[in-house]
Amino acid sequence: MNFSRVNLFDFPLRPILLSHPSSIFVSTRFVTRTSAGVSPSILLPRSTQSPQIIAKSSSVSVQPVSEDAKEDYQSKDVSGDSIRRRFLEFFASRGHKVLPSSSLVPEDPTVLLTIAGMLQFKPIFLGKVPREVPCATTAQRCIRTNDLENVGKTARHHTFFEMLGNFSFGDYFKKEAIKWAWELSTIEFGLPANRVWVSIYEDDDEAFEIWKNEVGVSVERIKRMGEADNFWTSGPTGPCGPCSELYYDFYPERGYDEDVDLGDDTRFIEFYNLVFMQYNKTEDGLLEPLKQKNIDTGLGLERIAQILQKVPNNYETDLIYPIIAKISELANISYDSANDKAKTSLKVIADHMRAVVYLISDGVSPSNIGRGYVVRRLIRRAVRKGKSLGINGDMNGNLKGAFLPAVAEKVIELSTYIDSDVKLKASRIIEEIRQEELHFKKTLERGEKLLDQKLNDALSIADKTKDTPYLDGKDAFLLYDTFGFPVEITAEVAEERGVSIDMNGFEVEMENQRRQSQAAHNVVKLTVEDDADMTKNIADTEFLGYDSLSARAVVKSLLVNGKPVIRVSEGSEVEVLLDRTPFYAESGGQIADHGFLYVSSDGNQEKAVVEVSDVQKSLKIFVHKGTVKSGALEVGKEVEAAVDADLRQRAKVHHTATHLLQSALKKVVGQETSQAGSLVAFDRLRFDFNFNRSLHDNELEEIECLINRWIGDATRLETKVLPLADAKRAGAIAMFGEKYDENEVRVVEVPGVSMELCGGTHVGNTAEIRAFKIISEQGIASGIRRIEAVAGEAFIEYINSRDSQMTRLCSTLKVKAEDVTNRVENLLEELRAARKEASDLRSKAAVYKASVISNKAFTVGTSQTIRVLVESMDDTDADSLKSAAEHLISTLEDPVAVVLGSSPEKDKVSLVAAFSPGVVSLGVQAGKFIGPIAKLCGGGGGGKPNFAQAGGRKPENLPSALEKAREDLVATLSEKLG
């Protein structure tokens, strides 16, 4: 969008002073705000409500606004934090429950990240769970990465953004949604009515009538649009409906012709979308009215902030610009005087660091898979952009340091009203970013080396073929995708070397990746899973397992292969739904109880036994999975449900021990560590946590000692049920990946040691744990560590197993337990000596073979000659092959070129190239020569100009590869010698 002509109410230019880079001047009519602090007015509740705000009613009215009133609204604080607060207050005053943003890591398995405000309400829209409130409002953190290349280039593309939304679950519908959207826009936010346009679905006459007759929007500013633009669907079938969008007009003076295009982003910006979920689309394409009509809306915070703050683009709002100002300071440039390329780089870094900070805060660490790859890719793009701005090191004198942590600190400083938990995790977030940046800088160096190699290869091939040298598009994409090398930089370096790039091939690879990204990020699917049908019309299961291990219950449903049945007999695999159960269903990292369902025989029913091996939850319905061991089970019959008490005790011990482990970790290595996953099993516990290095032996010992001391203190556990807000205020830690009821959560406390929100089963007293032992600590991903441990009965079994192993080891080595270490070290030393002796013998044998074949060397050239030897040495390993080549170079007269190959074992090829100084001086390099030969054997390699090694996996191709090496050497050397 070209903003050079945008008047935006004739906004004044914003002065940027490098001495005060965080200052933002919005307008003389708006509150001035700096990035260093939050306007105090944001924290204060309104003392009065405007008469224009109408209480929630089925007959909403829109009041006319006087010019004085409009000026009053426009003079309000329009900082991003204030806009967010005003939106939530607006809908709270109309009966909406204000709910917190959900995590960027969604519970929905169909999407990688939270991409829309409606995602946390998807089960309600599907009718899978009952609504807890009739309507709600949120400010949802969102991530979208399907259009990364446009970030920073357009006025409003982002990876991280906030979506303000109001939602109705069968409460109000189209009329109220439309009128409140208009009130919010023109009265609360004071947008001039003649600048707001609306779009509707082409067949939605109801929406047209509301906009025209009840709201009063002129017909020329209501645009009917087709299904592609204004009809929302969740997939081929399922909930769907028309939508209506609000657009802001930057140029009303251009008129209201029929051919006005709302997609013209030089004139319009869409800022509010209203989805009227009123139909169910059947398999045959029919639209059936939904019994419960829903409303799903989204207003982009960054977009409305751009409009209200009167700045040319989203990036210059107070939500993002303070971050840009910090980056400008690090780069020692002025944003206002920077060229377009530099401005784009500043915007990209600011945008990506917002996304990275909130993703890491929500438990996503950089890695090569899934969400972790998103974080890694964003950090790498930010590092590259920083390099293009001339940012070296941390800009504090350390050229090998990282600059992104300073940017992250600014993001965290602005996070108070987006996610208050971010500041509590600041040290971990910053450290993960620092480590990833430093790691990538090393990768970038390797990428530069690879580019140099690829360009040399391109020039070498062109020299032989007499064609124009070019870099393959796949190679350019490899540099971009794996090493984070911008194609623009690749093109610049290539041009300097006289090499062009196959951009068509590069674009093909980019498009393939883009399609994959869009498939993973672009759609929120509303589909009713099979388990929803399985449990339809079944009441919630009453859980009795905290207080009892057995209970009488009634069979409500039986399922075989997901289909309901009335009766199952011996040998059947079955899923049993009961009205009440003592069985704990797998959740919160704790595995499910095992046990039995018994049916006693009497005059009316047959005796039966069902062995339960797993219990899962579908919402609040427990599904007992097992096998009928004897007899038959029928719907409606009464059973005795009995949990295996020994296995339950093992789970309880390991679950409480997990809580103690988290507390000990925080005490020993720092409060910033946080849980990233867990497993509570019968035989062990596993705890994943965010940390950037391995734990030292003394730290592990201290953790063990702390936990065993707490166990010895014999402290009674306390459990209580509290509102979520009260539990958090009390200091309770939330478990990773869990979603909590706002009104009621279970708190498990070991007084003075640990307090966590937890629905799992626990011991009554820490003494029941008996003992605790860490059995391993390792890294499982970048920034993620894992501890495995045993406690209670599993601890005793572990110790007994170790004792048994030691007894067998002592018997084998014929030493006492205290002498095992010395004996093993002596054996290892003897083994090393034997291996060295064997290696020396192999090398001597290879050297002997080399001496024998040296007479096969032939000469190339006439006036000046070079000796060439290309031979196969069967059954010679790579090290011995190297020794043979070194011997030949030292014994044959310079200049000499030697290439040797071998297949030392099945599916393995070893190659070596050794060129004397006389050959290298002609410009023939071993490192470059060996690569194409190795490719023929299904491998690769490289090295120095005088010596290189390579390998492969196709020994059957070795003879032809060596023949190719012989031909190429002769041709190349003949040409060099003239």
From Swiss-Prot:
* Known EC number: 6.1.1.7
Keyword annotations from UniProtKB, A to Z: Aminoacyl-tRNA synthetase, ATP-binding, Chloroplast, Isopeptide bond, Ligase, Metal-binding, Mitochondrion, Nucleotide-binding, Plastid, Protein biosynthesis, RNA-binding, Transit peptide, tRNA-binding, Ubl conjugation, Zinc
Show the GO cellular component annotation of the record.
chloroplast; chloroplast stroma; mitochondrion
Null mutant phenotype reads: Embryo defective. Developmental arrest of the embryo at early cotyledon stage.
Binding residue positions for Zn(2+): 655, 659, 758, 762
Bound how, and how many: what does the cofactor note say? Answer: Binds 1 zinc ion per subunit.
- GO term, biological process aspect, one: alanyl-tRNA aminoacylation
Question: Cross-link of type Glycyl lysine isopeptide (Lys-Gly) (interchain with G-Cter in ubiquitin): positions?
Answer: 773
Cofactor(s) essential for the protein = Zn(2+)
Q: State the Gene Ontology terms under molecular function.
A: alanine-tRNA ligase activity; ATP binding; tRNA binding; zinc ion binding
Q: Which residues form the signal peptide?
A: none
- Which top-rank group of organisms is this from? Eukaryota
Location in or out of the cell: Plastid, Chloroplast; Mitochondrion
Q: Name the catalysed reactions.
A: tRNA(Ala) + L-alanine + ATP = L-alanyl-tRNA(Ala) + AMP + diphosphate
Q: Which SMART domains match?
A: tRNA_SAD (SM00863)
Name the PROSITE patterns on file.
AA_TRNA_LIGASE_II_ALA
Q: Which family does it belong to?
A: Belongs to the class-II aminoacyl-tRNA synthetase family.
What PANTHER family would the database entry show? ALANINE--TRNA LIGASE, CYTOPLASMIC, ALANYL-TRNA SYNTHETASE
- Subunit info? Monomer.
Q: What biological function has been recorded for the protein in this entry? A: Catalyzes the attachment of alanine to tRNA(Ala) in a two-step reaction: alanine is first activated by ATP to form Ala-AMP and then transferred to the acceptor end of tRNA(Ala). Also edits incorrectly charged tRNA(Ala) via its editing domain.
- What name goes with this protein? Alanine--tRNA ligase, chloroplastic/mitochondrial
